[in-house]
Amino acid sequence: MKKILLGIFITIFFAGGALAERYVMVTHTAGTDPFWPVVQKGGEDAAKAIGADFEYMFHPSGDMAEMAKLIVAATATQPDGMVVSLPDPDALGPAIQDAVAAGLSLIHI
């Protein structure tokens, strides 16, 4: 599983055609689901493999409005790419659309 995630993240990071510097991942975990630490580790490993910085963000409450604020805050830092989990498209869609409109490379998982 870790090798698959590492491969996915390396592919994503190189998809832009240039060596990236900084990536952000925003997920909807409340910090208790055992799935997300594996995903976080995959992002960290992929970033390390290409010499990039990686920041993992989540709101402890799991609240969608708070997650949208994290996406907006991450967008303001202009990372080279962003990965966002999308449990509620209605709540997160506007923040994601704004990130894309700002020119960020963004994928959702």
Where are these regions (language model features)?
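A residue-level marker of the well-folded mature domains of exported/periplasmic proteins
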Residues: 3-5, 18-107
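Bacterial N-terminal signal peptides
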Residues: 7-15
